[in-house]
Amino acid sequence: MLSDFFNNLASFFSNIFSLFEGKKQTRILMIGLDGAGKSTLLYKLKLGDIVSTVPTIGFNVETIEYKNLSMTVWDVGGQYKIRALWKHYYHGTNAIIFVVDSTDRERMDEVKEEIDTLLIQEELKGIQILIFANKQDMNNAMNTSEIVDSLNLNSIKDRKWYVQPCSAIKSPHGIYEGFDWVANSLNNK
């Protein structure tokens, strides 16, 4: 498949570049439902600023140098019809970042279904999951414990997981803390 070819080619060049930079190469899959703020969060970390985004049809890919890691982050669209394509991005993934719109209580069952689907994928077996509870700056945002309960995350026993509250628009602090968790858990593998 053409997407596999490009994924393998990107991985090859990332590995070549890492030999010169001395940074550990990692592949991060950033997914979540549409409108959760994935692209905004990615570009806030990459550029340090808010950029105007449109719904992602397909994917965005960026390399982020963070601590001792060179992270290739694949931000894949979250519209319902696109989610069936997520499986094409699983190969070689070292960590998953699932971005949740903390204000969208009505879609938490849908989020849970998607996370449950990820957990049973053989290619993602044991892969850690960071859940960014985005849009914490909004008055009606669910807090971390509400997200954990709503998604039944305490039942996950076969991998590391962590929920990090953040606001991609208001403050980078939660974003950095989340990526710290990813970096630390990848380095301690």
Curated annotation (Swiss-Prot):
Q: Which domain of life is it from?
A: Eukaryota
**Where, in this chain's numbering, is GTP bound?**
34-40, 75-79, 134-137
Q: What CDD domains does the annotation carry?
A: Arf_Arl (cd00878)
One Pfam family this sequence matches: Arf
- What's one GO BP annotation on this UniProt entry? intracellular protein transport
Q: Which UniProt keywords apply?
A: ER-Golgi transport, Golgi apparatus, GTP-binding, Nucleotide-binding, Protein transport, Transport
MF terms per GO, please? GTP binding; GTPase activity
Cite the SUPFAM superfamilies for this sequence.
P-loop containing nucleoside triphosphate hydrolases
Q: Identify one Gene Ontology CC term for this UniProt entry.
A: cytoplasm
Cellular location of this protein? Answer: Golgi apparatus
- Cite the NCBIfam families for this sequence: small_GTP
Quote the function comment for this protein.
GTP-binding protein that may be involved in protein trafficking. May modulate vesicle budding and uncoating within the Golgi apparatus.
Name this protein carries in UniProt: ADP-ribosylation factor H
Q: What is the lineage of its organism?
A: Eukaryota, Amoebozoa, Evosea, Eumycetozoa, Dictyostelia
